[in-house]
Amino acid sequence: MDIDAEREKITQEIQELERILYPGSTSVHFEVSESSLSSDSEADSLPDEDLETAGAPILEEEGSSESSNDEEDPKDKALPEDPETCLQLNMVYQEVIREKLAEVSQLLAQNQEQQEEILFDLSGTKCPKVKDGRSLPSYMYIGHFLKPYFKDKVTGVGPPANEETREKATQGIKAFEQLLVTKWKHWEKALLRKSVVSDRLQRLLQPKLLKLEYLHEKQSRVSSELERQALEKQIKEAEKEIQDINQLPEEALLGNRLDSHDWEKISNINFEGARSAEEIRKFWQSSEHPSISKQEWSTEEVERLKAIAATHGHLEWHLVAEELGTSRSAFQCLQKFQQYNKTLKRKEWTEEEDHMLTQLVQEMRVGNHIPYRKIVYFMEGRDSMQLIYRWTKSLDPSLKRGFWAPEEDAKLLQAVAKYGAQDWFKIREEVPGRSDAQCRDRYIRRLHFSLKKGRWNAKEEQQLIQLIEKYGVGHWARIASELPHRSGSQCLSKWKILARKKQHLQRKRGQRPRHSSQWSSSGSSSSSSEDYGSSSGSDGSSGSENSDVELEASLEKSRALTPQQYRVPDIDLWVPTRLITSQSQREGTGCYPQHPAVSCCTQDASQNHHKEGSTTVSAAEKNQLQVPYETHSTVPRGDRFLHFSDTHSASLKDPACKSHTLMKERPKQPLLPSSRSGSDPGNNTAGPHLRQLWHGTYQNKQRRKRQALHRRLLKHRLLLAVIPWVGDINLACTQAPRRPATVQTKADSIRMQLECARLASTPVFTLLIQLLQIDTAGCMEVVRERKSQPPALLQPGTRNTQPHLLQASSNAKNNTGCLPSMTGEQTAKRASHKGRPRLGSCRTEATPFQVPVAAPRGLRPKPKTVSELLREKRLRESHAKKATQALGLNSQLLVSSPVILQPPLLPVPHGSPVVGPATSSVELSVPVAPVMVSSSPSGSWPVGGISATDKQPPNLQTISLNPPHKGTQVAAPAAFRSLALAPGQVPTGGHLSTLGQTSTTSQKQSLPKVLPILRAAPSLTQLSVQPPVSGQPLATKSSLPVNWVLTTQKLLSVQVPAVVGLPQSVMTPETIGLQAKQLPSPAKTPAFLEQPPASTDTEPKGPQGQEIPPTPGPEKAALDLSLLSQESEAAIVTWLKGCQGAFVPPLGSRMPYHPPSLCSLRALSSLLLQKQDLEQKASSLAASQAAGAQPDPKAGALQASLELVQRQFRDNPAYLLLKTRFLAIFSLPAFLATLPPNSIPTTLSPDVAVVSESDSEDLGDLELKDRARQLDCMACRVQASPAAPDPVQSHLVSPGQRAPSPGEVSAPSPLDASDGLDDLNVLRTRRARHSRR
């Protein structure tokens, strides 16, 4: 038979079968092609980059199928007619028949299912449809696989697998489509969860539905009524079970993690073939099941994972997950381990990888589309996200880098306004040449409307430092979230500037020569301006790119910016400057190198002192200047020698003083190490050797020198800044740095200018009278009334003082060897140090002309414990009560804050008897802090060395008053010299004599020179006359002043011992008094000498009756407002008016709040320490007055006393004025006491070297270094004076208490320690504030 005929016959048979099977359709191919359209869903699910590759084969396939259906290939008609061809055709037809038979069986199964559905719908039953899960509709599997590109024109079957495909299959190599891993989306996760619940529900309902269907069929066949009822009961039970299953919650239907589900059905039905069954199963069992923890891994959990994985050899991850016990799957454990494994960590891109990626992109890109998922197949160890990020952020040649142009910023702002601040992928297309990351960073970090640009203020810098300490360096986004109006890049840039500035400052300190360092206001201002320029420059240029290279370039550029000019704060004017030692050595020790006139004046005057009467610096004073100071004196050390010469008239004519008034600081050039290292500045022969030696030891001294300079800067800033408030004081020896006496500070020059300006006392009186609102007319009236009283009233007050004076003389005679006397040279040294203002008694000390006795050396005693302090306090209280009860009521005079001032006799040669008139003691009751006027007993200052005792720096806290003699030179501090004596006080016969002038008037006077001590209300001066005692030594005990205690009946006079510590000698049981010559006539001496500040217009008479010209009163002199402040006159006048000052409602006047000073702070602290005792005394007063019984300090007694005071003194103007003054003076100190600084301890600690934990690291190192220096300083002081108590005890001794003996004062007083620690804490507070700035 012809082959063509057979072929035609077979074709006809096939078409006939098709018509029989599908009478309503043209061909089977139509069904297949229609079902194949579902493949578009897969193409839709693919990513955009693969759409083109997936769409191209489909289009080609459709075109080929249409061409094959329309016309036949002409090559098919020319087949050879041989048996081989027939066999091949037979094989092809067999394959076609098999495929058609499979399709027919599927269609039959589908037809059968459709018939069942139709029958089920027609039956009308409400029971659920019973469906076999194994017989799924065939159309679900048709069309979900890509058809081959080429297929047979008749059968549509493609060619068999080629050799390459078969080889890959045998080797297990996956196809390219199988290598694609797409990320699971949120809707896919939700669909997976829903599919698992549906499959679980179907598995539970299937047996119940089959049972229900069986019961229905059986019920339809049963005829008896009983069987039908039993079946109905079973049907109801089955329906109830089905309802219970339908009501199960979703969590119960999810099942366990490893439960089996029909993953094939879920993959084909629910996911429509987009995900394979195996991929879905792995994702559900490894990540998505609810029992798997999806929280972030903690650090402890990761560490445990590493340890457990190491025990299992990094295998058996399911065992690792079980042992970990944190609901993690094995896949999660493996994935996290790979992330933290350094061997598997992704490394940086190499040049070869960049070159390969660039080449692949250029070859495989189609227009703007880049198939990253195909390119990653050729990049081993990289994923598609890495490729996208690397190409779009770094390798794309169209990207721009560097600064943004204004046009680009404008385009970026327009794009943000158009698309919003989120669609950066669209925004980048509006800004050509910039990536989405660049656009986002530029807008958020620079162009956002809420960002603040420009210089950082101090508050922002402080917040930045605190946030860096809180979160650490590197968390800039977190820091910027809490720092308003600043971005993370700004915070990073500012932190780099601060760190570089700190390192530069430390490096600058380390590289600076040892003696050429200069700390001045210009340095601080330049650093501040550099900070400003750096911050502004970095803010303008650092945000253009996220890389550190550009940021460093911008920081380097900001260094070259010119610092902008701005006003330097006033506090910077007080920054000390260091002096070049070699320059000071060439110009003379103790002089100022910038002004040689001063040096010449000082040296010449010291050499020709015996020839001229000018006020110059003696050799002893020069030696005093070279002694290392151990006290924090606010007097600048460079100008201490001028304290002896600033009250005389010659100083105004001296050209050196005139040059000091015009002194300006010049920048000092650092000298070579050779000129500084040598002992002799003029020795140039040893220059190279010294230079080499200096360079060899320079590196070893950097740290110590940096610490010393830093500490010295902070201390001088603090001490010099508080000079205008606290005046001229001595601070306790705590951490005094040692420096040469020739070092000059700017404060020295300012103080010299003030001292050369010879300020009179009248403006000071006028100032204080106006500040405290003193009634001058009333004071004058009281003065006149007191002067008119007879002198007989003095007798009752002197009866109690004579026995004490006799006892004092006897005790002093016995204890003469224990108290080494001081020469005039020592007195001059002590006068050069200002006494610390105290609210206590002022002590005078005798200065007989004896040879100084060196104090024994030894270790400092151990501080007392708390129990010892409490025991001493109880003893003092008991002694005070006994003394109060023993004393009688001898006078009704009210004396407050007694201070004993006694003049001594003229010194006589050692060993000669005391011949002269009988001595008498003068007792002056003055109310405020002591002053010191020291004079020399000899006519000239001795020139020569000083003893070992004199080399120890004195620490005087009190004032020694010596009578002036022939050749006497009076050295008074500038602060007290300005307060010259006013008429109406103790008759002195005129002002204090100046240096270089013989005070002939002072020789004729019998009373000592008493400096005025100001107070708000008039005080009384009581003179007690002592009969002559022969054989009495010159050093005697002082008379005890009368202190008055208010009781319910009258005033009690109590003897208060004046206890003052001597730093260089051992204390006697009571203080040493000074004796003066007897008054010429008791009748000529007034009984009571008034000493009010306002009584300056009276005309006092001298002891010989001569008239003294009166001084104009304060009301006649103009008020010098420059004494208060350097601000404008209008501001000072407004403050003096007290518009916002202290005000007590009954009074109509206001009083301005006074600035805090050391005096007010100490007074407030003393009041707070004695607060409990004062409350008890006030309570006892109120209780005794109310009930007349024993005082009962119980609850309510204090309130009763307050009500009593309010009721009795409600309209008393004196009480109201006192209350107003109290508020004016102590309001600001009390307010400061309520504001403890940050990180500074407010309690007193016995360890003076402990520093707060929040101090910076540099200050901590400085504290450790200074601790050793402090111990050395303390050891030196203990060796000089092992038993020298602090004079702070002078105003803290209870009434009636005896003075402590030398044995009792062996250990330092706790109050003294607390006082010194108070000063130390104040210093540390100010220093910590400066360091934070």
Swiss-Prot record:
Residues 1131-1247 are annotated as: SNAPC2-binding. Signal peptide: none annotated. Residues 672-686, 811-826 have a biased composition (Polar residues). Pfam families: Myb_DNA-bind_6. Residues 289-343, 396-451, 452-503 form the HTH myb-type domain. Residues 317-341, 424-447, 476-499 bind DNA. This is snRNA-activating protein complex subunit 4. The lineage of its organism: Eukaryota, Metazoa, Chordata, Craniata, Vertebrata. The gene is Snapc4.
